[in-house]
A protein has these predicted regions:
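Middle-to-C-terminal accessory/interaction subdomains
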Residues: 60, 71-73, 291-353, 358-516
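Regulatory N- and C-terminal appendages and interdomain linkers associated
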Residues: 19-119, 447, 451-516
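Internal "kinase-insert"/substrate-recognition segments embedded within catalytic cores
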Residues: 146-147, 163-180, 184, 205-210, ...
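Conserved oxyanion/phosphate-binding beta-strand-loop segments in alpha/beta enzyme cores
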Residues: 95-186
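Beta-rich nucleic-acid/ligand-interaction surfaces
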Residues: 213-229
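Short, well-structured beta-strand/strand-turn elements
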Residues: 205-218, 351
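Sec-dependent signal peptide recognition
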Residues: 2-9
Length: 516
């Protein structure tokens, strides 16, 4: 089957141009990468095979970014000038992904002229001074055109030979994706497994969530060995975007409206506690400006009249104190209840329920809303000892931002004593708790990661001014929290081990569910 797959790729390479590939046994050198494969062959027959291979934990992934020193300096300059509101993509010459399969067979894929920028909200910080000095999160775009006069200086603008060529770039994909998100281990998760496991659990129980895996990040800066090397292990995330929707919904229902709940908007936290039409739309903020909306439309930007989100917000913020019986008119009820149950069981304090944060809403073509989590890096005991997440009860009304920020959607459904949604929520927790809080399933994820990467944790970039951290405190929360090992014993003053966490959480579930 694999030989047939290679033959298909070879035939396609004769017809197309723009990306590259190589298959080999043991030799991954960049010199062996064939530069003849097509501009968008990932939209052909084998797209999903490559996508699946990228996120298969049994496979070992290495991502290599080739970038000029002048361009990586611009990423630092953008942070210094704009802080967390500087989402300007800079040019990387190429990105190469190497997949090593369990049988040691390797495949190498390369794409040229990509966009790269810093990612995050409060996690952004200075990282470059005559070399990479600190870890940061990155966002990679395969579709950036670099021709927006509002963002780029005249000398930086790319001139496209034709509208067709520019349109091809705007539709270009790699591994069936338009972008990638790369995050370092900011939370000090020495298992490197908890948010990978969280995304897997959501999908297992029918909630749409981004695919997540682990890989080695290699930065080649100006072909200078003194500046280049690995940044150790990074988490690799599938973005939630129009391609994600088309991959996960049938053709007759995948052209709806996708909104991102934005943190730090000028219109307030995305609590769903407003009817205001000014809270939603297309974010038109420029670098350095606060985001202009709380719910940022990511698809159908030109044709949407925002009626679906308006209907949802008007319903949630009506005068009714109990809207449980009407949930299915506006929301996919089953996945909504499961989403809430897993949020509780995973102890994720940086989500919709506990922090009014980190969720998307997709309105399908009939107007029904599907909630989708993302950024699940504070789950299953990560940074949760001081939040009490292992011992919080299913109906506790905790919100990190204060009581006023608890969503009216929660207040009028699971908070209503004896309501139909509260009953279903508690039943769902009881039903899935042993499957979510499952040591065997977690360790399957962990040992796939451990076996592939146990010797690759320590970065090799010489300029990194990094120290080994054995704990996390509030002052160094987002700084160089890195160890040179992968271990199940990741307990600190702020982190529970997975075993500690699930033991306490299951005890709380068993003691409390029957009392409500």
């Amino acid at each position: 089957m694999r030989k047939f797959f290679i033959l298909l790729l070879t035939l396609l390479s004769i017809l197309l141009h723009g990306c590259s590939f190589d298959f080999n046994n043991g030799d991954n050198s960049e010199n062996n990468v064939d530069n003849t494969l097509g501009k968008d062959y990932y939209d052909e027959l084998h797209t999903e095979n490559l996508y699946d291979d990228l996120f298969d934990l049994k496979n070992k992934i290495e991502i290599k970014v080739n970038i000029k020193e002048t361009e990586i300096k611009k990423i630092e300059e953008d942070f210094q000038k704009y802080g967390s509101e500087g989402n300007i993509y800079r040019v990387a010459d190429s990105l190469q992904i190497t997949i090593t399969y369990p049988d040691s067979y390797t495949s190498v894929y390369k794409i040229e002229d990509i966009g790269i920028r810093m990612k995050g909200n409060t996690s952004r910080h200075s990282f470059y001074n005559n070399g990479i000095r600190d870890f940061i999160h990155f966002k990679i775009s395969f579709q950036e055109t670099f021709d927006d006069e509002k963002l780029y200086k005249k000398s930086e603008l790319i001139s496209w030979d034709s509208l067709e060529e520019r349109e091809n770039r705007k539709n270009r994909t790699f591994f069936g994706l338009r972008a990638l998100e790369l995050k370092y281990n900011a939370e000090g998760d020495l298992t490197y497994s908890k948010d990978v496991y969280a995304s897997k659990i959501y999908r297992e129980y029918g909630v749409l969530a981004q695919q997540t895996t682990i890989g080695i990040l290699n930065m080649n800066i100006g072909n200078k060995s003194s500046l280049s090397g690995t940044l150790g292990l990074y988490k690799i995330y599938e973005p939630l975007d129009r391609i994600f929707i088309k991959r996960n919904f049938p053709k007759n229902n995948n052209d709806g409206e996708l909104y991102k709940a934005t943190w730090g908007s000028a219109k307030g936290m995305p609590t769903l506690n407003t009817k205001s039409s000014k809270s939603y739309g297309v974010d038109d903020s420029m670098p350095g400006e606060t985001k202009s909306v709380s719910y940022d439309l990511k698809t159908n930007k030109k044709k949407s009249n925002h009626q679906n989100i308006s209907n949802l917000l008007n319903w949630i913020n009506s005068s009714s104190k109990d809207i449980s019986n009407e949930v299915s008119k506006y929301i996919d009820e089953d996945s909504f209840i499961t989403w809430l149950a897993i949020m509780y069981l995973s102890g994720d304090w940086d989500n919709f329920m506990y922090d009014s944060n980190n969720f998307f809403m997709y309105f399908d073509e009939s107007g029904i809303c599907y909630f989708m989590p993302f950024d699940m890096d504070r789950t299953f005991g990560l940074l949760s000892k001081h939040r009490g997440m292992a011992t919080i009860k299913p109906l506790d009304k905790y919100n990190l931002q204060g009581d006023n920020n608890r969503s009216n959607l929660l207040k009028k459904t699971i908070d209503v004593k004896g309501s139909v949604i509260q009953k279903k929520y508690l039943e769902r927790i009881k039903e899935i708790s042993t499957g979510v809080l499952n040591k065997d399933k977690f360790e399957e994820v962990y040992y796939n990661i451990y076996n592939n990467y146990k010797d690759d944790v320590r970065p090799t970039i010489q300029t990194l001014e990094y120290r080994y951290e054995t704990d996390v405190d509030q002052n160094t929360f987002y700084h160089l929290i890195h160890e040179e090992l992968i271990t199940l014993n990741d307990s600190t003053n702020y982190n529970y081990t997975y075993s500690e966490y699930i033991k306490q959480k299951q005890r709380i579930v068993d003691r409390n569910i029957g009392w409500y």
